[in-house]
């Protein structure tokens, strides 16, 4: 019985370590053609928060509306494919 408990403990630790390494690997990935992510994004207007989100629709206030790609990834807004040609003029 002691051998099976030890084996189960080793398997459990291995599973936890693999989950942690997979999670870290996902956080290191970055989509291509991304101009800025989350806290790296400078505010574009006074009410902008620095990209925290829970779903894609939360990024509407963090990305300029002319950014075609506005996604929530690991609770950070990703704004990309922004064409400066259609950027609003500063007031």
UniProtKB/Swiss-Prot annotation:
Residues 1-25 form the signal peptide. GO terms for cellular component: extracellular region. Keywords: Antimicrobial, Disulfide bond, Fungicide, Plant defense, Secreted, Signal. Disulfide bonds join 41-82, 53-72, 59-77, 63-79. It is found in: Secreted. Coiled coil: none annotated. Its main location: secreted. One of its GO terms (biological process) is defense response to fungus. Belongs to the DEFL family. This is Defensin-like protein 269.
């Amino acid at each position: 019985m002691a051998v099976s408990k030890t084996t189960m403990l080793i398997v459990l630790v291995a599973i936890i370590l693999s989950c942690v390494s997979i999670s870290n690997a996902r956080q290191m990935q970055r989509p291509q053609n991304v101009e800025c992510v989350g806290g790296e994004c400078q505010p574009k207007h006074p009410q902008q928060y620095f990209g925290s989100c829970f779903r894609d629709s939360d990024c509407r206030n963090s990305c300029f509306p002319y950014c075609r790609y506005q996604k929530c990834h690991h609770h950070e807004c990703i704004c990309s494919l922004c064409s400066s040609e259609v950027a609003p003029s500063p007031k």
